[in-house]
């Protein structure tokens, strides 16, 4: 049948179903196909913490939201244009995110009485009960159609049913005029060792596409044209993958081999897994028995001359705190990547937050200041990791890089850079010295000490957690301790001399300055433009460098009457700013729900104080 093709600037699709319905893969494949087609994209995987949550329950719903556009896309979108609900629980959990004009695709085979009741409905009519009967509802027997498509495939019934996500993906590909070839290529690569599965998956994908083209419920299809991008080679990249590659780039630029000692933890494990793939680039990885062993092996590797890395999330950062103090007092280069998740304790492992900031800044015994930087988007994780490595090695100090589950698991198009565009990394390595070696003698500008590797004659020195003097001799002298504490703090403070100036986006004479840090950038930036479109005078100051702050921070704040600090915690950055720059007043907008901001929340918060 004929369908009207409508051009649109952008569209948001939300796939949701049981944890075993393959929604993460479905969303990823749609995002990858759109990225390869040339669209701007932003993704938001949202899944339960349980390995297999209870079947058919709201708590067990797994979702994946994709925002594609022909222009700039900075968030996964607040509300969706298309909602795919593979069962009643998925519809119940996600109907609130469907726009009034949304299309809702329902697998009618799963909407039986038992599953409707299990999802907590009061009636047997979920659509009416949820008040979405005025949406464009596409009732499709997806499970039955999948079985029919693959009845001659030779696969067992359980394996066939698992393919219903591919049928659904085919329907969505038709609705948005996505080419099938990219996904065909993925299937050929994924099932290279199981070739019998390639053609059945291709067939069910095509049959879903063909089915959608022949039903009256889909009256229109949509085209999102490729975005206008700078010339170059692009790929879709997740935050965790970008972090790993940025660390490898820092290793290459410094000439120091990369060593990563880590313990698997959600949502940071993918960084260790990605690094382990690249042994051909001189990367060494160790999956340690626990968090403490992971960081301690990394410190040992740093002492031996490696660019040392350890990765973790909030609970692991707590366990690593004593060893972080060891890295700080020995003044060895180390990058600790904390992919933040909901806490405290185990918390909600698969949900995102920014609640580790205070721990990163202060969570150690003694006077133990550590440099803290943050990534603001999945692709920016590359630059953030690269510069964290540069600062760690050039200034001989541990650096904490804060990312978030939202960034680590999320993805967006990334223009693959040329390493010629990145600065050299020049660690203060010493091969020989005249006279007695002073391991804690400092560069007069940066206050960094020299990096002396074991085995160099005349450069032997002690390291360890006990206080030392400049000569590296253990000392409990009060005056020496005060001197060393002050020098280590001064070294971190002087890092500000090497940071770029903080930038402000928006009106210089704005009524409100929105302040954020880390992974909230896309939502704050989009909110800024929506407010400007309303005629409001607003500006955005988003921080990638936390400790130390950029040197011009106070000059920026002095220009604005109202400063609104927005963050996914109870106000940790606002409290830090009050301590560092108490001459200014700070308003707050906070969210601690294990979910990222939605743009409307920020717009409403700013309008409330204008």
Feature names for model-found ranges:
Residues 132-135, 139-143, 351-404, 424-435, ...:
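Conserved thiamine diphosphate
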Residues 11-18, 168-170, 258-261, 308-311, ...:
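Short glycine-rich or small-residue beta-strand-to-loop segments that form or flank ligand, phosphate
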Residues 47-48, 187, 204, 225-229, ...:
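A glycine-rich phosphate-binding loop feature that marks nucleotide/adenosyl-phosphate handling sites
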Residues 237-246, 254, 389-610:
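Flexible, low-complexity linker and terminal segments
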Residues 50, 148-150, 217-232, 250-257, ...:
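Gly-rich Lys/Arg/Thr-decorated short loops/hinges at beta-loop-alpha junctions or inter-strand turns
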Residues 10-98, 245, 250, 258, ...:
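Thiamine diphosphate
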């Amino acid at each position: 049948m004929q369908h009207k093709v409508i051009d649109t600037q952008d569209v948001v699709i939300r796939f949701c179903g049981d944890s075993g319905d393959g929604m993460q893969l479905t969303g990823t494949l749609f995002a990858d196909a759109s990225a390869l087609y040339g669209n701007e994209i932003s993704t938001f995987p949202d899944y339960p913490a349980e390995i297999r949550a209870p079947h058919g329950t709201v708590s067990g719903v797994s979702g994946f939201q994709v925002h594609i556009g022909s222009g700039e896309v900075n968030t996964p979108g607040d509300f969706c244009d298309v909602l795919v609900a593979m069962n009643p629980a998925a519809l119940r959990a996600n109907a609130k995110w469907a726009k009034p004009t949304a299309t809702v695709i329902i697998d009618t085979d799963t909407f039986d009485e038992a599953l409707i009741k299990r999802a907590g409905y009061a009636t047997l009519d979920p659509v009416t009960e949820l008040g979405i009967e005025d949406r464009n509802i596409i009732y499709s027997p997806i499970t039955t159609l999948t079985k029919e498509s693959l009845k001659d495939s030779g696969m067992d019934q359980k394996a066939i049913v698992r393919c219903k996500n591919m049928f659904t993906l085919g329907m969505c590909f038709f609705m948005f005029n996505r080419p099938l070839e990219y996904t065909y290529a993925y299937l050929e690569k994924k099932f290279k060792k199981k070739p019998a599965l390639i053609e059945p998956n291709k067939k069910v994908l095509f049959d879903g596409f063909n089915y959608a083209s022949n039903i009256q419920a889909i009256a229109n299809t949509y085209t999102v044209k490729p975005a206008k991008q700078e010339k170059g080679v692009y790929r879709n990249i997740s935050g965790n993958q970008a972090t790993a590659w940025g660390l490898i780039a820092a290793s290459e630029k410094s000439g120091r081999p990369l060593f990563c000692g880590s313990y698997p933890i959600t949502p940071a494990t993918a960084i260790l897994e990605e690094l382990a793939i690249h042994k051909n680039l001189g990367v060494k990885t160790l999956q340690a028995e626990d968090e403490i062993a992971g960081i301690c092996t990394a410190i040992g590797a740093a002492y031996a001359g490696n660019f040392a890395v350890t990765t973790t999330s909030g609970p692991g950062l707590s366990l690593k705190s004593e060893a972080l103090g060891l890295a700080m007092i020995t003044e060895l280069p180390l990058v600790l990547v904390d992919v933040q998740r909901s806490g405290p304790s185990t918390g909600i492992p698969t949900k995102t937050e920014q609640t580790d900031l205070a721990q990163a800044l202060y969570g150690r015994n003694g006077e133990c200041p550590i440099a803290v930087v943050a990534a603001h988007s999945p692709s920016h994780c590359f630059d953030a990791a690269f510069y964290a490595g540069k600062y760690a090695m050039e200034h001989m100090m541990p650096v904490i890089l804060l990312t978030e589950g939202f960034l680590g698991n999320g993805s967006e198009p990334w223009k693959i850079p040329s390493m010629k565009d990145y600065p050299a990394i020049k660690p203060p390595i010493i091969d020989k010295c005249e006279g007695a070696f002073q391991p804690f003698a400092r560069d007069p500008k940066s206050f960094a000490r020299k990096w002396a590797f074991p085995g160099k004659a005349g450069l032997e020195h002690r390291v360890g957690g006990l206080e030392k003097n400049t000569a590296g001799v253990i000392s409990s002298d009060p005056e020496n301790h005060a001197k060393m504490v002050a020098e280590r703090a001064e070294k971190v403070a002087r890092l500000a001399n090497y940071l770029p100036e903080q930038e402000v986006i928006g009106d210089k004479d704005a009524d409100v300055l929105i302040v954020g840090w880390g992974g909230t950038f896309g939502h704050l930036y989009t909110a800024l433009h929506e407010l400007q479109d309303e005629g409001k005078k607003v500006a955005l100051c988003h921080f990638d460098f936390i400790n130390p702050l950029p040197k011009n921070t106070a000059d920026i704040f002095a220009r604005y009457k109202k400063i609104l600090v927005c963050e996914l915690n109870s106000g940790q950055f606002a409290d830090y700013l009050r301590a560092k720059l108490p001459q200014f007043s700070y308003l707050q907008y906070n969210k601690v729900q294990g979910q990222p901001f939605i743009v409307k929340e920020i717009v409403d918060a700013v309008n409330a104080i204008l």
